[in-house]
């Protein structure tokens, strides 16, 4: 296993922790800053929008840079953003700090995925991307529950200080072991933008948007759902987040292998499973053990899609891998924002936390429809890999 993949996974762990840990700390942040749970949920939306907006601009701004230099600069922005989160004096400053942190997110994962795929033979690309994204799933296995526990014990700001420390270690690792690609072709802006033509590419992005919307409609409000519906204590929420993280990790590994097998077939099955497990939580969420089992299966289904979606979008934009890969991360976070908004809308309109899983299931069905349309378009275009 190349050491570079391990360092990329560590970087993904740091970024994933700061993105997702806010969900476990939502009640704490809301109470400390004197805002409602839905208002605190906008910190998730703000981060996601920061990724969506920053991703294409950062990708284009670093297009002429060697990929190693770009990743180092992006990790530096990440560290600064988390420093600002740790010292934020109020809700507005924390929101701004979250957006600053988010600016590096899309481009880092996009460029990092291209680097990861370039380190292995072509028939193992999805598995290599999955290995990098293992850092993201481990952020949910370890980073989110430990960060939540730390935030509950020592204040939510302490969690962001811990993320800063991890970011510094990741930055050093990138500098030391990431290979310099001296044969990298200099990017041509016109060629990069031309790669965005075609219905298939935009359908592939829509798959990512609806998938992420489904996932985050539920994930954003999982802590209050567990506490208020299932009756789990704050300490118990940490344990459930750990279980969800294990499911995400398992799904990521399985998803990488499935994507190397048959891309579209795998995604169809994954989105069906995501829709079913999301809907099931509407009823299983009333009791502890059924809720835990459902959330584990839901998490496995959710992250099984990630490596497949990343490889799928590059299939439609081979002439600009950095840009299209980064745009896919941006699409993921557009979906993140959409999902958090939909979940908050459901709650604000009096439908209750138990209606959120049904909304998530509906969004998963939209991802399934987009997948079928994308596969059809791929067959028409002769892109066998995507179909």
Predicted regions and their residues:
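Paired small-residue
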Residues: 6, 77-84, 92-101, 289-297
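Helix-breaking motifs and short loop linkers at transmembrane-helix boundaries and internal kinks
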Residues: 34, 66, 87-93, 231, ...
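Conserved MFS/SLC helix-loop-helix module at the cytosolic interface between two early adjacent transmembrane helices
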Residues: 53-92
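Helix-to-loop junctions at the C-terminal end of transmembrane segments
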Residues: 55-67, 251-263, 347-348
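Cytoplasmic helix-loop-helix junction between adjacent transmembrane helices
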Residues: 97-135
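Intracellular juxtamembrane helix-capping segments at the cytosolic ends
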Residues: 108-120, 304-317
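C-terminal membrane-cytosol helix-exit motif in multi-pass small-molecule transporters
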Residues: 164-184, 370-374
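C-terminal transmembrane helical hairpin of 12-TM major facilitator-type secondary transporters
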Residues: 265-309
């Amino acid at each position: 296993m190349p050491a570079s993949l391990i360092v990329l996974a560590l970087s993904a762990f740091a970024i994933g922790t700061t993105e997702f840990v806010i969900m476990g700390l939502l009640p704490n942040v809301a109470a400390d800053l004197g805002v409602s749970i839905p208002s605190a949920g906008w910190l998730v939306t703000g981060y996601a929008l920061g990724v969506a907006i920053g991703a294409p601009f950062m990708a284009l701004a670093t297009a002429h840079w060697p990929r190693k230099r770009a990743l180092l600069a992006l990790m530096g922005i990440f560290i600064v953003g988390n420093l600002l989160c740790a010292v934020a004096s109020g809700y507005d400053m924390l929101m701004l700090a979250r957006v600053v942190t988010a600016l590096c997110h899309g481009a880092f994962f996009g460029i990092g995925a291209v680097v990861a795929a370039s380190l292995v033979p072509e028939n193992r690309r999805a598995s290599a991307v999955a290995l990098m994204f293992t850092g993201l799933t481990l952020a949910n296995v370890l980073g989110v529950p430990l960060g939540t526990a730390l935030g509950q014990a020592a204040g939510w700001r302490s969690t962001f200080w811990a993320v800063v420390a991890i970011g510094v270690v990741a930055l050093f690792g990138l500098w030391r072991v990431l290979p310099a690609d001296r044969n990298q072709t200099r990017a041509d802006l016109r060629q990069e933008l031309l790669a965005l033509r075609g219905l298939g590419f935009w359908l592939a992005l829509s798959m990512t948007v609806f998938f992420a919307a489904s996932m985050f409609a539920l994930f954003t409000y999982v802590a209050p759902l567990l506490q208020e519906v299932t009756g789990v204590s704050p300490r118990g929420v940490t344990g459930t987040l750990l279980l969800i993280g294990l499911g995400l990790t398992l799904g990521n590994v399985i998803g990488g292998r499935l994507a190397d097998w048959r891309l579209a077939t795998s995604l169809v099955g994954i989105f069906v499973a995501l829709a079913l497990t999301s809907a099931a939580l509407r009823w299983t969420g009333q009791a502890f053990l059924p809720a835990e089992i459902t959330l584990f299966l839901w998490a496995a289904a959710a992250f099984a899609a990630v490596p497949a979606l990343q490889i799928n979008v590059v299939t439609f934009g081979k002439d600009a891998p950095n840009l299209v890969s980064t745009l896919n991360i941006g699409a993921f976070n557009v979906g993140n924002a959409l999902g958090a908004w939909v979940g908050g809308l459901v709650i604000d309109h009096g439908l209750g936390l138990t209606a959120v899983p049904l909304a998530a299931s509906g969004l998963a069905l939209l991802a399934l429809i987009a997948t079928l349309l994308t596969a059809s378009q791929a067959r028409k275009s002769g892109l066998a890999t995507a179909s």
